[in-house]
């Protein structure tokens, strides 16, 4: 059985400490907005999303060509359509 609270903590940490400031900010804001509204399957999909390298995540978000085949699921759709306003 999955410990949802532990999974959320892991996801929050990984979202905010990616390696590039741009992706730290983008994924951190995305996770902060949605983390408490996600079901177990969505959390597992978000964990899978975080396993993708920053370049492909950035390109996918911005509609550029990627070297990765993104699944069609709720998380990828939310991420692709996330309205990130950098401060």
Feature-to-residue mapping (PLM):
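Positively charged, polar, low-complexity stretches
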Residues: 2-43, 47-87
């Amino acid at each position: 059985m999955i410990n949802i609270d532990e999974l959320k903590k892991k996801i929050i940490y990984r979202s905010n400490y990616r390696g590039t400031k741009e992706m730290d900010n983008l994924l951190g804001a995305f996770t902060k907005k949605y983390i408490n509204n996600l079901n177990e399957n969505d959390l597992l999909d978000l964990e899978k999303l975080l396993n993708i390298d920053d370049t492909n995540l950035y390109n996918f978000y911005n509609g550029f060509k990627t070297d990765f085949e993104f699944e069609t699921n709720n998380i990828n759709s939310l991420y692709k359509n996330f309205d990130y306003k950098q401060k």
